[in-house]
Amino acid sequence: MQTQSDWPPVTDDILRPSPFAHPVLHTLHCVARVLLFPTYWALDQLIGCWAPTARPSRLRAAAGGGVALLLLLLVGLPLALPGLLLWLPLQACRRPFCYQPPPPCWVPPTPWRPCAEFARCFVFLTANLCLLPDGLARFSNLPHSQQRAETIGATLLNGLRPSLYGATGCSPQRPGEPGGTLTAQMPAGLDFVCLQEVFDIRAARRLVRRLAPNLGPVLYDVGTLGLQPGPYLKLLGSGLLLASRYPLLRANFHCFPNARREDAFVSKGLLSAQVQLGILDGHRIVGFLHCTHLHAPTEDGLLRCKQLTLLLDWAEQFEAESRQSGEAVAFSVLLGDLNFDNCSKDHAREQGHKLFRCFRDPCRLSTRQDQPWALGTILSTSTLHQSVASSPEMLRRALEQEKGRHLYLAGPPRGGRRANPWLGRRLDYITYREMPGSVLIPEVEQVMFSTALAGLTDHLTVGLQLRVSALS
């Protein structure tokens, strides 16, 4: 039986900060990264000089600085070789994520007790940030990953402040279907934040330093690296980062075993977490979060379908292993960048996947038909740095108009024909389901499309407000 003194629950024995079981292994891993960094940095800068979006002035600077970078690369190689030989075997001992606990002064929301508070709302957010190593990020016309990470972190805090000292408020229950809104602000009262493409570890740490003290526990540096079955050499993690305003109880990560082209070097997969939300009849009220980022190349729909099937199996397995007798489940939410839309013929396989029979997508009416208020979430990279696309308020106003959507939202894959009216390609999803037999029922209150990160990434941010109420 759980009492008020058990809040927040103690999870030190389950979620330790270091991904290594012994401090010596953690120290060796830090040494390996230090040895690899000079070569990594020089190579990253060289790659960035030849990005298609590089300006002529940068190309001229690259010609002058290229010799210095090559010299640094050569000087760093004798350090990089032992660093790599140390780094590779350590990956077999590494837990596939880092855990940043909140500071001792952290105060979580008051536990939800349905006997006293009939319903509670929870706000979820998903965003693809394109925080790659700086050289690779330039290929998406998004340089300066470290500076962008700082600004993104500050912007995310704007979504936390309205409800730092209490639970997210629910409006009175309203009849009818939920609606969607387009806003220039970050969704208010964030409870759960799932970020994708946070590949650069320095950028990830900048975000963690912002989120952990102000929101709560954070899972970052997620992925299984090094030599993996296939065989694959995974050089980058999954890019996933999960932050929660409620205490984390358990977490796990599975890497997709199938990947092609550039994704073969990336540890994409499914990050699952269990959070405690409150107490009902002396037992825990919990929720499940499943964060993912699927295979990117458009033509690999069959591979994405296999990944969808795998993540459904992994989600079921994680939930079955985590549940305890008597506890109530408020929700199971699957969110992230699925890299397919619900409007293109090229994605017919994914659009008909059983995922949409297991989880509800509030933006979707049926196959190839979205709600009239749903909006595409991928922006055109060619217009990212125009004044309108770099201003949250100006971009919001532009996307309310058909002309603006044609100009600033990415077009169909492979240059296909645009639908009329054109609402863009929605790649970022927040889906949910209720648990069979549960006394707690989740319902969508609102879906939010946000331009708050305009100029900082090539995706819109998506938010979902979910109202969970107890059966009377």
Segments from the language model and where they lie:
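Active-site flanking residues adjacent to catalytic metal/cofactor-binding acidic residues
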Residues: 127, 195-196, 292, 335-337
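N-terminal, active-site-proximal structural segment of metallo-dependent hydrolase catalytic domains
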Residues: 1-210, 220-232, 237, 467-472
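Lumenal/extracellular "mature" regions of secretory-pathway glycan-modifying transferases
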Residues: 204, 217-240, 244, 249-267, ...
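Conserved beta strand-loop-helix elements of the APE1-like EEP
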Residues: 212, 234-251, 273-278, 334, ...
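Catalytic metal-binding/acid-base residues of hydrolase active sites
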Residues: 130, 198-199, 247, 295, ...
